[in-house]
Structures are given as C-alpha cells and as structure tokens.
C-alpha cells in the first residue's frame, strides 16, 4: 500500500525486537493496516512481566468494558484485548478491527502468559 508506514509493532516496548527475534512476538498471517500504518505483528513480552498493580489496572479496564462477568474473566476474549492493549500501548480499536485468526494468536499468547509463565 503506497504511502503507508510500516511498523513492526514494538510499540510500548523499551527495546525494539526484530520480527521473530522474541519468543513473544506474534506474527500476523498477513499485514494489518491500522490508522495509516502497516503492522506485521505485535510484541507481547510485557504480558509475561505484568505486576499485580498492572493486572488490577487491566481488571478495571475490563470492568468498564464488559456487559456480563464470566466465571473466569482471564479466559474471555475481551480480557485478552485489555491485556494486549495494556502491554502494547495500542488502542482497543486496533484489536477490535483485527482479523479473528490473528487475534486468536494474540489471545492464546496472553493466556499462556498467565497460565504457562516462562
């Protein structure tokens, strides 16, 4: 796409990771265009480094957005959106508009961060 900037979404990360360099980098099936930029993936390393205070902040974001409270919010898609938004510093809309197949990769990685730490 002409005139489109490319970002390998290291947004919100202190150090830039090259595509595939980090085990927590999620590569999309095909480039994703959002607000004039092209994204090839997202770095989710921050999900493995969350503090309790950050999780409380994510819980509060989730509470503002949810309509019903599932038995285990961590297993909901919306909670994964909230975590991904927090760790990447990308807006909610970035994840809302993403192809479902790509977001399933993100959602799976977020769940791994909680249930299968490094």
Task: Please name every model-derived segment.
Residues 2-118:
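Short, surface-exposed, charged amphipathic helix/loop patches that serve as local interaction elements
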